[in-house]
A protein has these predicted regions:
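Dual-mode signal for accessory low-complexity, basic/Gly-rich regions
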Residues: 12, 27-206
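Active-site pocket-lining segments that scaffold enzyme catalytic pockets across diverse folds
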Residues: 1-24
Length: 206
């Protein structure tokens, strides 16, 4: 769940957008999630490691909506990428001791759903409960997505047995527009993302 939202955030990174290597290019104002879901960045959450009042370039951080009710609102930028995009920096520069500033996200939360993970499994009926992801192959220009995975086989809404050495594939744009969140997000970590039910993924494995 966190990795899927992480791939989305990578596509909203101003450096990738400025290079033209984002599958969300030209998508500001477009529908990218179900209409009841938002992604909010809050750099002021107490006792969370990614909280900070200023970014690495000395600009004040702010609470902002990256996605508002399914609509993409904003890129994530530092001074360099914002100049290239003719925008104002969102105050998201980060850097290491010997590296140049790059855009990065602070604390992120995705709107919680109304059902538990168990209820979503019953809604799914038959499918896979993914618990671990391995490697990745993502086309940054198209959003085509393929990753190794392991987890549990689910039948009639009930977990049956563990499975591994699977490959799951799809297109991130389609996957994200169909997600249904559970209500189990952990509130004490930097990325508050619940379990996600996703339809239409291709699964391969023996």
């Amino acid at each position: 769940r966190q990795s899927l939202i992480g791939h989305f955030l990578s596509a909203t990174n101003g450096a990738a957008v400025a290079r033209g290597t984002s599958w969300l290019l030209n998508s500001i104002g477009s529908v990218v999630l179900p209409e009841n879901l938002s992604i909010i960045e809050d750099p002021y959450r107490p006792r969370v490691s990614s909280s900070r009042p200023f970014d690495a370039e000395g600009l004040e951080t702010k609470i902002r909506k990256i996605v508002d009710n399914g609509i993409l609102c904003d890129w994530t930028t530092d001074l360099s990428s914002s100049r290239k995009l003719d925008l104002k920096s969102t105050g998201n520069a980060t850097r290491g001791i010997g590296s140049i500033p790059m855009p990065s996200n602070w604390n992120i939360s995705l709107t919680d759903g109304t059902k538990s993970q168990s209820e979503l499994l019953k809604d799914m009926g038959c499918g896979i409960l993914v618990t671990s992801m391995i490697g990745s192959a993502i086309n940054p220009n198209t959003g085509d997505y393929s990753r190794g995975a392991s987890g549990f086989w689910v039948e009639n809404g009930e977990v049956q047995y563990p499975i591994s050495e699977l490959t799951i594939a799809g297109n991130l744009s389609h996957m994200l527009r169909t997600i249904i969140p559970a209500n189990d997000a952990r509130q004490y970590i930097s990325r508050v993302v619940p379990s996600l039910l996703i339809d239409g993924i291709t699964i391969a494995g023996s």
